[in-house]
Amino acid sequence: SGKALERAKERLGEKAKLVTWIESDITEFKPNRSYSIWHDRATFHFLTEKKEINRYKEIVSGFVTNNLLIGTFSVNGPLKCSGLEISQYDSNSLNSQFKPTFELQDSFTEDHTTPFDTTQNFLFSSFSRKP
């Protein structure tokens, strides 16, 4: 959301000017350039339809030149977020989504405490583009 982006910019201070910030519906995003690093903190797990997931993969496959960093709800995470259905992933299932173009480098899970004092388990994975 725009509010989340603003909070992230505030945390980064002057360094925020070094980041390309984009607020968009990912399924309608039309990149006009390539990206060396793509960091998705919590978008991919909201894509539950095959068409949406495939569109996301088309975008990153076409416009990410080096590294892909993705945070999703793990298989031990919630089934819904903010009332919305989500997709859960483990390292293998997330890797299978991106392995034609990207190679999994690392994955780990981490508990995140929400502002409502609940715990959500996330999977964070880093990928590098295959030559």
Feature-to-residue mapping (PLM):
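Class I (Rossmann-like) S-adenosyl-L-methionine-dependent methyltransferase catalytic domain
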Residues: 1-33, 50-131
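A conserved beta-strand element that flanks and buttresses the S-adenosyl-L-methionine
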Residues: 39
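Short catalytic micro-motifs in class I SAM-dependent methyltransferases
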Residues: 42-46
